[in-house]
């Protein structure tokens, strides 16, 4: 996430294409929302909260600051980039061996029905589909982000965020075209680091 954001900043400020783009759009970037957790390489913030589950409760001071900035900016498009663990315990439970998700990037659009249908269509259709085409053209693999579970020796995959605790749902409920983007990375250390940063960019 943060590396891809830095690559985007470099592109916008130091290339002719980026300079032209900045004449047409206004951007606000938050390279790292949970700076304490990022520094300690843990999910929770320095206050002990999971910022990914604090979109409605607004318990953490960082969440309040981010919410305030988001409200003031009032974006038309909102992206939230995270990392996912390609080795899912559910795969290992079924197969008895570690199995990795093949995708470089996974997309989680919101399926919350209080988000206008047109915005959901734009998020899940045009924006996601164009991103997937660009990724494929550059040699990367993508798919839908899903939450796996094992029941009766079968794997179930739930996709589309519906909880307002999810950033893609919260952002969609503000009438922004919203996508939650997951890049493979958790547990990989520096392995394939350049590929992971570049596919996010």
What are the functions of these language-model segments?
Residues 1-201:
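Structured catalytic-domain cores with a bias toward divalent-metal coordination
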């Amino acid at each position: 996430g943060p590396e891809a954001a830095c690559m985007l900043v470099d592109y916008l400020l130091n290339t002719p294409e980026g300079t032209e783009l900045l004449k047409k759009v206004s951007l606000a970037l938050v390279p790292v929302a949970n700076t304490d957790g990022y520094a300690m390489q843990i999910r929770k913030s320095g206050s002990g909260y999971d910022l990914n589950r604090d979109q409605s409760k607004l318990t953490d001071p960082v969440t309040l600051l981010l919410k305030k900035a988001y409200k003031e900016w009032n974006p038309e498009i909102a992206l939230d980039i995270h990392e996912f663990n390609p080795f899912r315990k559910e795969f290992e439970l079924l197969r008895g061996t570690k199995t990795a998700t093949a995708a470089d990037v996974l997309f989680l659009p919101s399926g919350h029905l209080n988000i206008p249908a047109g915005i959901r269509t734009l998020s899940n259709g045009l924006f996601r589909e164009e991103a997937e085409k660009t990724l494929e053209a550059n040699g990367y693999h993508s798919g839908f982000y899903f939450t796996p579970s094992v029941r009766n020796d079968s794997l179930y995959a739930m996709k589309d965020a519906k909880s307002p605790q999810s950033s893609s749902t919260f952002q969609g409920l503000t009438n922004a075209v919203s996508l939650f983007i997951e890049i493979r990375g958790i547990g990989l250390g520096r392995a394939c680091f350049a590929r992971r940063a570049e596919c996010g960019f």
